[in-house]
Amino acid sequence: MYCQRLRQLRKAHKLTMEQLAEKIGIAKSSYGGYEAESKKPPLDKLVILARLYDVSVDYILGLTDDPDPKVERKNLKEFLEKPDIHWDGYKLTPEILDPIRKILKLVTANNN
């Protein structure tokens, strides 16, 4: 899937393989391998490509059809009110969460 997305994005941006390879700092043959799916692009190159095209890495990999790289923002206060929160497999009880909530309240109150 990534090979098709990379080809589609490159053509949409009117770039040759050589131009794109130069932009991301690799040989044309390496980039050609990505589009031919004979080579897998390393994560750092996927991130560079995603930024270059203003899409998400998930989009390039075919994990989503939404190219928008927006980060979903979550309200931590709402999250900490949920009844079933875990940290590294360990359930966080109200006794653990209450001091965390208090610290966050103090920190945010001092910054306002």
Curated annotation (Swiss-Prot):
Residues 17-36 bind DNA. Keywords: DNA-binding, Transcription, Transcription regulation. InterPro entries: Cro/C1-type_HTH, Lambda_DNA-bd_dom_sf. Signal peptide: none annotated. SMART domains: HTH_XRE. Residues 6-60 form the HTH cro/C1-type domain. Coiled coil: none annotated. GO terms for biological process: regulation of DNA-templated transcription. This is Uncharacterized HTH-type transcriptional regulator YobD.
